[in-house]
């Protein structure tokens, strides 16, 4: 008898699910906020969820759909989010009214790696930020420079040996060997060779970190679900690797700072304190216990900031130099002159003071922002300046640096690689929020100066000995890898590295 009711039950179930997954789809219409029509189950993120397009590309496309709007109403699954286009509104969110948008709203279990400086919110973030900011001061970076320099010299030796065998390289993979060496030394006080026995595990860890699991999609489409299920976006192998790494270093240093003044020394100083405090809003004190989990979480986020993002940025930079020989020639001339003026040595100040090199780096990040979108969550109701839109508490706000960086309103011929955009007079003409590779305000990338320094040093050393040229396999129309967390090139980047004939 039940077989007669089965079609009716299925129909009711389908209708129920349909209404459940579309129940919020009038949210922005009721508030007179324009936006694209959402799709059942996926909202506006179907191509990202199905791994057809990178999230950064999806956000750029959404940004371009409504060029006259200050904000665009979109949906992550059933959750209403606001994509902000207007630069003045962005300035309020990131800087002027930061206290309303101090949280990122990346919600998952606070156990394991969850309590890191990037993902943490509220008092935990403020406490961590207050304590970890000092490691990225100019003085600290200058003290670490000799470690970076050793890594860069070893990298150049490696490239020289490889060039005797072949000229073509997959440049991103090659540059990862340098950033791994640098981060191992500057952060953890170990040489690349010391952890060679763990490279197989590290390769797995890198793949897992770079290629998002469906837990990330769940976090995006069902905000708040992961903490309820006590889940993390990172599998247990990642937790285990960083736990073992930190424990090994703590044991080697007998649980005390070593005097290297590296990242692990700072961690150990905090560990000796047992807990750390900082001021909350309202002048109350916030306290965070320095557990093994907290230590591992900070080691993890430092690794992320210093390894993959820098390698990817340098890969794009070398790609553009290979395709633009005039720019490469100008940069080589600056590098040669700077090194000669410093007696043949490359110092911290040598790298920092090369103006054209820094402009090339900035233009690379304009064209190839690495992590997108920028995300903030309102901690209370907030009326957007210059609009009638009220953002309700806990609403997620998104910003697309890629959309802004390719907007012809702010950059002429935005698809063209042109470091001249970053001469002071040109920068002064633009809105400060027209360039957002590191975010802006108090929640900008805390490691941006470290990443810049290690990248510029590597490029300086590389171009002092070699030229970069397209190979027969160079893709002149790079596509973005659709499923990586980091916005990397699909299929990698193949270039020729050719020893310079004018240097010994």
Curated annotation (Swiss-Prot):
This is Cytochrome P450 6B2. It holds the Pfam family p450. Belongs to the cytochrome P450 family. The lineage of its organism: Eukaryota, Metazoa, Ecdysozoa, Arthropoda, Hexapoda. The gene is CYP6B2. Heme binds at residue 445. Its main location: endoplasmic reticulum. It comes from Helicoverpa armigera (Cotton bollworm). It is an enzyme of class 1 (oxidoreductase). The keyword Endoplasmic reticulum applies. Keywords: Endoplasmic reticulum, Heme, Iron, Membrane, Metal-binding, Microsome, Monooxygenase, Oxidoreductase.
